[in-house]
């Protein structure tokens, strides 16, 4: 994005890029169309294929400047306001995209922002580049006493 680019121009550029790389949805989904599973129960081969498809799509967006949109420049982002991320997501929702693997959602949606916002500079330097380029995937372990996943007592 250039400094002169308005949100409408950004939206148009995003839509143009998406239309060159994806197929437009034939109809919009309604909330009544059923749920969307976050955690899939698939075999290892399918799991690897799905994660690879997610990473490839993410890398394509990253190369075009449509990933880490609201991340600071010093961490590999575009340095734009979060409203630009929202704009891109709204436009992307109009297209058929690869399914996003849950490990990638945890990595980019939970772990990366936590490291970016609260991690030491050393941790940021070590972790964020691999997360951003899709070469590193993270997991999040939770400890919930009396809820079946009390890792603290193990």
Segments and roles (model prediction):
Residues 1-11:
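Intrinsic disorder at enzyme termini
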Residues 13, 28, 48:
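Extended, charge-enriched "interface" segments that sit outside catalytic cores
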Residues 16:
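Mature N-terminal segment immediately following signal peptide/propeptide cleavage
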Residues 24:
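Conserved beta/loop motifs at nucleotide-recognition and modification sites
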């Amino acid at each position: 994005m250039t400094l002169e680019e308005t949100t409408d121009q950004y939206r148009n550029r995003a839509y143009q890029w998406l239309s060159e790389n994806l197929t437009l949805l034939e109809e919009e989904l309604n909330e009544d169309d059923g749920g969307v599973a976050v955690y899939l129960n698939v075999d290892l081969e399918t799991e690897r294929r799905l994660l690879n498809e997610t990473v490839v799509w993410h890398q394509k967006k990253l190369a075009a400047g449509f990933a880490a949109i609201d991340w600071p420049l010093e961490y590999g982002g575009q340095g734009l306001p979060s409203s630009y991320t929202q704009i891109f997501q709204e436009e992307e929702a109009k297209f058929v995209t690869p399914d996003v693997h849950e490990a990638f959602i945890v990595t980019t949606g939970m772990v990366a922002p936590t490291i970016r916002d609260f991690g030491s500079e050393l941790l940021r330097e070590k972790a964020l580049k691999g997360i951003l380029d899709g070469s590193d995937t993270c997991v999040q372990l939770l400890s919930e006493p009396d809820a079946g996943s009390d890792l603290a007592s193990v």
